[in-house]
Amino acid sequence: MPARLHARDLMTTELVTLTEDETLADAQRCMARGRIRHLPVVRDGNLVGLITHRDLLAASFSIFAEVDRGEQRRIFSTVRVVELMHRDVVTVPPDLAVTEAARILLENKYGCLPVVDESDLLLGIVTEADFLRLTVQLLE
C-alpha cells in the first residue's frame, strides 16, 4: 500500500452512469441492479450532475404522496434525470489525498465524491463504502 493514498487509489472506476435524457425510472433500475446509491450524470463522458437514492426517495414522498403506485411509476418513467439531479456537484482531482477527501465527505455529509480531471471528465467515484473497505484493509 502506498505511503500516501490519493483519490485515484481508492476510487471506483467501473461506474454506472446516466445521461440527462434518461428517466427517474431508469435511475431507480440502475440503483437497484447495481445496489448503488449514487449515479453520476454525464454528457460525452463529462460530469454534469449527480442523482442519489435520497433524491428519488424525496421525490417519491414529497411530490407523489397522494399518487398511487401505478401513477407514480408512470410519472417516474416520463420525468428526466436532468430535472432532479444536483448540478453543483463537489468533485475532487485524482491526486487529492484520501485524508482530504474523507474530510470533505465528513464535513459536508456527502455520500460520494466524483473524481474528475481538469476538463471535468469523470474518472471515478469515491464513496463511503470505499473508505470502509480501506479501513478494513488497514485493520487486518
What are these regions (language model features)?
Residues 1-14, 53-90, 97, 102-106, ...:
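Tandem CBS (Bateman) regulatory domains
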Residues 31-34, 39-55, 105, 113-129:
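A glycine-centered beta-loop-beta connector
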